[in-house]
């Protein structure tokens, strides 16, 4: 059934993001201290992105020697997992359904996908916030992954997801990440420039 396939793909996507997140968190814990934080953060970011690309490339090269069908199945699953648009569309639909039931439910639901205070939003503002989030994330979740798939295949798409995860974890301008995450944030800007 479609629901079972979608659930399996969702589980793979969550594991992938958690795996990327653990690598980034470990690297940040080891390297984000002392001097040369910009250099250390940049080297970690580049190493993770290039590492994911080559690991994926070599993985499919080895698997492809044994089974073209298995290769195609795994690639299809990864492509589906990397496209986060369906999850976000579902979340936006849930916001619309919640706000139709009650304004308070709508505010709570939209708070899950926006990064601002939703307690004073009107019903129309709740819907607008959900749609704005969908539009903003369409590039990161659908357009850019497809672009990098077209340019560099599944390894490129996976490397892009690492770029995106790095930016979402360390690409902030606060005291902790201003230096360490600045190169990750710039790489994300470059990776999204053409697709956006």
Residue spans of the language-model regions?
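"…together with the soluble PPM/PP2C metallo-phosphatase catalytic core" -> "…together
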Residues: 36-169, 174-189, 193-196
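Interfacial/capping segments of alpha-helical transmembrane domains
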Residues: 11-19, 66
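Non-catalytic, topology-defining segments of multipass membrane proteins
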Residues: 31-34
């Amino acid at each position: 059934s479609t629901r079972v396939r979608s659930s399996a793909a969702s589980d793979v996507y969550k594991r992938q993001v958690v795996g990327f997140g653990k690598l980034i968190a470990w690297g940040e814990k080891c390297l984000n201290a002392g001097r040369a934080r910009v250099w250390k953060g940049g080297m970690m970011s580049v190493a993770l992105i290039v590492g994911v690309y080559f690991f994926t490339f070599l993985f499919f090269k080895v698997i492809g020697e044994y089974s073209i069908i298995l290769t195609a199945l795994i690639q299809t699953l990864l492509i589906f997992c990397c496209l986060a648009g369906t999850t976000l569309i579902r979340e936006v639909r849930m916001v619309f359904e919640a706000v139709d039931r009650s304004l308070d439910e709508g505010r709570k639901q939209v708070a899950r996908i926006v990064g601002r205070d939703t307690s004073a939003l009107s019903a129309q503002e709740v819907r607008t916030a959900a749609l704005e989030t969908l539009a903003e994330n369409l590039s990161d979740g659908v357009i850019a992954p497809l672009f990098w798939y077209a340019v560099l295949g599944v390894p490129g798409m996976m490397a892009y997801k690492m770029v995106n995860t790095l930016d979402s974890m360390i690409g902030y301008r606060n005291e902790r990440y201003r230096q360490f995450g600045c190169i990750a944030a710039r790489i994300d800007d470059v990776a999204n420039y053409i697709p956006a």
